[in-house]
């Protein structure tokens, strides 16, 4: 503004053409400085984040979505478990599961019926109580054929769940899930399934807020806007406050969460860093608290430089080569056998 006043006073000594060009350039410079200023305000380093109780997390790629009944990726999983909570959860201290939204459960003698007691203080982020009926609705949603979920089989151990998902039966009342009262959920399995409680820690079985789902298109709408920050209502330890595509997803401590007193973090910033070199640079320069994947050639270096921080975790996966057997020389079975013999089989 001051610069503009000075130029206005000197305007009679400047040609109109040069004056207009100069004003446009000044405007462009101001826009650039504004953008840089906003960018700097939004960025945090580890030192600043520590003071605010915020975790800066290298989360790999940009998530495809945040609907627990539709997405399938590891990237999405990390965010969803911060926003939602199922009946059980993975034990962060080791193997097995621990109570989540359900404070306890009773298994019948034949192992086919389970009664889950949902916590009295378990509520949604808007204050609505979390009920057994919310789980009935949510499981009906993931099993609804029109939704096209990729993980409906996570509930196939439930009586008639597979049949409903495949359209063999139309009445969901025949599926083995029932709200006995507001806080008691009865699940009937097709047969004794020892690993079922562990399956319930998977985000595909998590509850969604029925009123919100209905508000934004209904139970089978895949393109719903309910996962936007302004719309999402969740039941986990954090709530969604910002989703800037390809930049950051921010979640903030949910003060209504039943175990909020034990939450050490005030928030998490999930950063989509899909380049290993960039991730390495971010970690070393103090822009993230973690490094998701270490480049193979740098593993020993990190073990030496960061012996306390370095963690080598097991990862179960399937790795394979798919080859075109119609082209030379791969159309020769002897060549393919030779390739097979050259590989290390685990």
PLM features: residue spans?
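Extracellular/periplasmic solute-recognition and catalytic clefts
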Residues: 241-252, 269-329, 337-338
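Alpha-helical secondary-structure segments
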Residues: 131-138, 182-188, 236-237, 265-267, ...
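Aromatic- and charge-enriched surface segment that lines or borders ligand/interaction sites
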Residues: 103-151, 186, 282, 329-331
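Surface-exposed binding/hinge segments that line
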Residues: 117, 136, 147-214
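N-terminal lobe/hinge region of extracytoplasmic solute-binding protein
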Residues: 58-109, 231-234
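Bacterial signal peptide processing site
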Residues: 39-41
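A structural "hinge/loop" feature
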Residues: 61-77, 101, 128, 144, ...
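Gly/Pro-rich hinge or "lid" segments in bacterial periplasmic/extracellular proteins
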Residues: 91-92, 172, 189-263, 267, ...
């Amino acid at each position: 503004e001051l610069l503009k006043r000075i130029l206005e006073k000197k305007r009679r000594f400047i040609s109109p053409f040069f004056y207009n060009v100069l004003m446009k350039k000044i405007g462009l410079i101001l826009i650039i400085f504004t953008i840089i200023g906003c960018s700097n305000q939004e960025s945090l380093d580890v030192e600043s984040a520590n003071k605010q109780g915020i975790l800066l997390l290298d989360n790999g790629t940009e998530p495809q979505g945040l609907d627990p009944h539709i997405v399938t990726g590891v990237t999405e999983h990390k965010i969803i478990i911060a926003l939602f909570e199922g009946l059980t959860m993975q034990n962060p201290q080791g193997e097995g599961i621990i109570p989540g939204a359900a404070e306890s459960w009773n298994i019948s003698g034949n192992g086919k019926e389970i009664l889950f007691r949902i916590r009295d203080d378990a509520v949604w982020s808007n204050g609505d109580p979390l009920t057994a009926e919310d789980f009935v609705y949510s499981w009906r949603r993931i099993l609804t054929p029109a939704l096209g979920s990729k993980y409906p089989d996570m509930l196939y151990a439930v009586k008639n769940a597979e049949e409903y998902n495949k359209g063999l039966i139309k009445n969901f009342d025949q599926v083995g899930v029932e709200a006995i009262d507001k806080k008691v959920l009865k699940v009937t399995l097709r047969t004794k399934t020892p690993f079922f409680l562990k399956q319930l820690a998977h985000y595909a079985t998590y509850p969604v807020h029925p009123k919100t789902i209905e508000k934004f298109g209904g139970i089978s709408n895949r393109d719903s806007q309910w996962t936007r920050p302004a719309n999402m209502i969740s039941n986990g330890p954090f709530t969604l406050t910002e989703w800037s595509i390809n930049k950051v997803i921010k979640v903030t401590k949910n003060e209504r969460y039943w175990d909020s007193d034990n939450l050490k973090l005030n928030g998490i910033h999930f950063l989509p860093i899909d380049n290993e070199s960039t991730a390495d640079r971010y970690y070393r320069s103090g822009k993230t608290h973690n490094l998701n994947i270490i480049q193979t050639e740098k593993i020993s270096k990190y073990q030496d430089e960061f012996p306390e921080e370095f963690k080598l975790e097991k990862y179960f996966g399937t790795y394979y080569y798919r080859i075109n057997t119609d082209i030379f020389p791969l159309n020769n079975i002897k060549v393919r056998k030779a390739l097979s013999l050259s590989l290390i089989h685990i």
